[in-house]
Amino acid sequence: MTMIQINDDAPAVIVASDQTQSAPIVIAHRGASGYLPEHTTEGVVLAHAMLADYIEQDVVLSKDGIPVVFHDLILDDLTDAASVLPDLRRADGRWHVMDFTLAELRTLTVTERRSPSRPWKDKGNRFPLESGRFRISTLAEHLQLIHGLNRTRPHQAGVYVELKGPAEHRAASLDISKAVLEVLTQHGYDSPDDHIYLQCFDEAEVLRLRTELKTPLRIIQLLSQPADAAKLKTIAEVADGIGVPLSHVVTGKNADSTPQVTELVRNAHANALQVHVWTFRTDALPGFAGTAAEYLEWLVVAAGVDGIFADQPDVVVDWRTARRQQVNGGKSFRLLKERGQEKSQSEK
């Protein structure tokens, strides 16, 4: 990876350090999307300030083949495309990202998501729908921004890139994997030790990334359905981990208030796969979870997940910090107690 120097005396290499830090790694889901419209550069800055370990970039290609950071393949729920460029609507009545050049995408304003099906929308605590003038940015711009923040702030955030709709891109004669890997290489991401994950739902594309395109980067296979031990073994041949819904790991609460935990994490770890779960939202906790802290305790301590995607990454970071202090405080107390006992015995 490209060397990024924090100061003149510091080592100028950023490498992944997940193995040396306590779980979970905290992934800012589409940036700090619980506070600002998703995938905006403003949300990236806030996520970095909140000390997220990784900041997510969902990537779609523009009509002219430029990787842009945008979650959906269509623009309807997150932009004003309908009013700004009405003539680019398809026969299906939707505005598709791949039908717009980068220059055209730059004319749109990004908003908070309009979809009425999101349960947290009823809470009224998300960014106002029609406020601000947020823009669509390219993957390269997001990487440059994060690199700059890594240089100027005492925190090193990684990137977590999702390849959206490889099959849909192929139908439009676009190769999203090649385009994204080219941008990543240009910005120094070319080693499994680099502070980056690639993720994708398309299992055939994940295999292609590893075999045909031969990327050395760490890959997460996204799964929408639960995976058994046999499937996990197959995934482990090409991927470094799995990304799954929270409900695949903790399914409910027992009568004695203990969590109902599946075998997924245990089976994944048996195949040397990390488990990253999505999406933790303080304003959309499952009904069986009393508090955010309790739910995080179940996910991390009881279930053993390795990473958490969060709309409010600061909440998970703060919980992790408090837990580390609690654990380390307990160790310090035990150590002092043991040393005191040793001293007493030596004086006898």
Tell me what each language-model feature is:
Residues 1-348:
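Phosphate-group recognition and catalysis centered on beta-loop-alpha active-site segments
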